Each structure stands twice: as C-alpha cells, then as structure tokens.
Amino acid sequence: MRRHWLLVGACGWVLLILMFVSKFINFSFRIPGDYAGRSEIFVWTLSSVTTKLPSVVWPEKGASQPYILSSVSPSVVEPIDWHLVNEKRLEQLSTVCSNSSIWNLTHTTVRKFVLDRIFVCDKHKILFCQTPKVGNTQWKKVLIVLNGKFSKVEAIPENLVHDHERNGLPRLSSMTDTEIHQRLNSYFKFFIVRDPFERLISAFKDKFVKNPRFEPWYKHDIAPAIVRKYRRSHHDDSESVGLRFEDFVRYLGDKTGRQHLDRQFGDHIIHWLTYAELCAPCDISYNVVGHHETLELDAPYILKSAGIAGLVSYPSIPPGITRYNRTKVERYFSGISQRDIRRLYARYQGDFSLFDYPKPAFLLN
C-alpha cells in the first residue's frame, strides 16, 4: 500500500513539472531577411510541435537564398529543395513571356547572334548560353573539361578560356539548321542571370576601369565614342578623364540614338545587352535559369540536373562575392538624374521582370 502511494506521488510530481515547463518552453528565432533588415519570424513550441513556415522565403533582390527549417532539427536553417526554386523561376519566366505589354522587351528572334552565344557539349548533351558578367568564365571551364580538352578546371589557362579558336568549345551557330534544331529540342540548356543594374556596374568596371584582360578597344575606341555623344559637359579632356558611369548610363538608356554606336561597336556590346537579346529565353526552352546571387546553390544543382555532378566540379566561390550589394549600386547611381535612370530601367525592365528582380524603387523614386 505504501509503495502504491509513493508511485502516485511520483507521478503527480512529474505532471506538475511538465505543466510548469510547458508554460516557459517556447522557442523562437529569426531567419535573416534582405539587405534592408527585413526578416521572417519562425516559431516552434514544445507543446504543439508546429512550424509557422511559408513555402519559400524570398529575400528582396536575391541578396541571399530561400530557406526552410531543417526537418532534423527545428533550430537549424537549411536551403529548400533547389528543384522547387528552379520551377518557380521557370514559371515566372513563362508568365512574363506571355505578357504582351512588354513583348518587345522579352522576345528575340533566334538568329545567328543568339546562336553565337550558345556553347555546345555534345558528349554530355549540354547547351550553355553565355551572359557576360555573371561568372561565365567558370562555366566555360566546366564545359572545356567535359569536352576532354583538360582533366580539371584548375589546369585551364585563363587566356585559353576566351580563345574560341583553341578552347574546344563549339558554338551552336557553327552547325547546320538540322543539327541546331535537334540540339535545341533535346539537350540540357541553361544560363545564368544577375541583378541587371549590378551587372551593368560590373561591365563598366571590367571594361572601362580595370580592363584586366587588356582589351584596348574599350578604352581607346568605345569609350571616346560614348563620351563625344553623351557627355553633357565637354570642359574636361575626354581622353584623360575617360568614360564616366553617367555617360555609360545615358548611352544605354538612349533607345534610338545608341543604335548607330551599337553597330559600330559590333559584338563588344554583349557585355551590356539584355538577357533577352543574348539568350532569347522566351523563344528557347531552357531547363535551368541560375542566379548569380545564389550561385553557391545553383552550381551544384545545375551539375546534378545535367547529369555531370560526378565528372566535374564548379570552381570554389569566395564567400559573399556573389551577394547583391545595394550600397555599391547606390554609390554608382548617385548624382545620375532620375530621367536617365528611368530611361535605363525602361530598357532593362524585361530582364527585371523575366527573372523576378524587384524594381529598384530606391533609385527610381
């Protein structure tokens, strides 16, 4: 009898302890949001074991990546299934492509110019469309290895990557119409995009400021031509001052006036053409659209989706190098008139919409 009452008493103490603990255990944490400090709050409680979770948390401007809570430990944040991310991107692409109000900004005839941008790996049935200033050099290295020119990406000389006579990467334009259609209809196709305005900044820095590959025609031919037509004050010596970003913005936003210069510049304009003009995403059915801002997660997904994950690795990506930098964008656009920025946005509006990059209201308003 005594043992019975001791057991009842012990059970009572356990119940009291559980009731007391359940009132105080309520775990909550934040997942980092966009660069402006917005965040999503997720709550997990011991009593109900429920998760307050949107299907995908999309940070503004692609500054980070979508997240879910870990199925193993609710206190751990991990990326969502990247297949769902890609499906969402393709759905967005399809929706915008069918929007007749911006049809002229999103559709391009699949002509030789576009086919020149697409590199072919017949061995593994892959097509890669080149969109400059989004890490294309590394993807070219991956294809060079797959084509058997080198055994690993680290062994490829930098000067060879862009030498299209020697790098072993055939362009789709070099093939017959029958071969082109067969590959477009059956091969794995992908390309990479980036916030349109940040990409323009990267192109400006790479070609007109740093010019690391020593391509003198950008500074000696293209820059002076833009300065002569678009610099509002000619008191400065154009040769010594060089091209300014505001000159570059005026040139890009001049819908009709730039056409003569574009013809004069030839294929060098690929570094600032729209993604629609380069890869015809509304007219070619791509399997994957990668984003520069989430390249750490996109790269392995692309390798896996193309069936080559065990054959080659994407070169390591320095932490944070692909992250969207709003401060840099604001700095470059400071001092540029609202009219010029709006004209620039009007040209790249199709790219912003196709790939779900938010309208840069902080620049336009």
UniProtKB/Swiss-Prot annotation:
Q: Signal sequence span per UniProt?
A: none
Might you name a Gene Ontology BP term for this protein?
Answer: proteoglycan biosynthetic process
The regions listed as transmembrane in this protein's record are 7-27
Where in or outside the cell it occurs: the entry states: Golgi apparatus membrane
Which InterPro entries does this UniProt record tie to the protein? Carb_sulfotrans_8-10, Sulfotransferase
Q: What is its main location?
A: Golgi
The residues on the Cytoplasmic side of the membrane are 1-6
The membrane topology noted for this protein in its Swiss-Prot or TrEMBL record is:
Single-pass type II membrane protein
Give glycosylation sites per the record: 99, 104, 325
Any one Gene Ontology MF annotation carried by this entry is: sulfotransferase activity
Give the UniProt entry's GO cellular component terms: Golgi membrane
Annotated EC:
2.8.2.-
Q: Which residues lie on this side of the membrane: Lumenal?
A: 28-356
**Protein keywords:** Carbohydrate metabolism, Glycoprotein, Golgi apparatus, Membrane, Signal-anchor, Transferase, Transmembrane, Transmembrane helix
Residues engaged in binding 3'-phosphoadenylyl sulfate: 132-138, 194-202
Keyword Transport assigned to the entry: answer is no
What the protein does?
Answer: Catalyzes the transfer of sulfate to position 3 of terminal glucuronic acid of both protein- and lipid-linked oligosaccharides. Participates in biosynthesis of HNK-1 carbohydrate structure, a sulfated glucuronyl-lactosaminyl residue carried by many neural recognition molecules.
Instruction: Tell me the protein family, please.
Output: Belongs to the sulfotransferase 2 family.
Q: What is this protein called?
A: Carbohydrate sulfotransferase 10
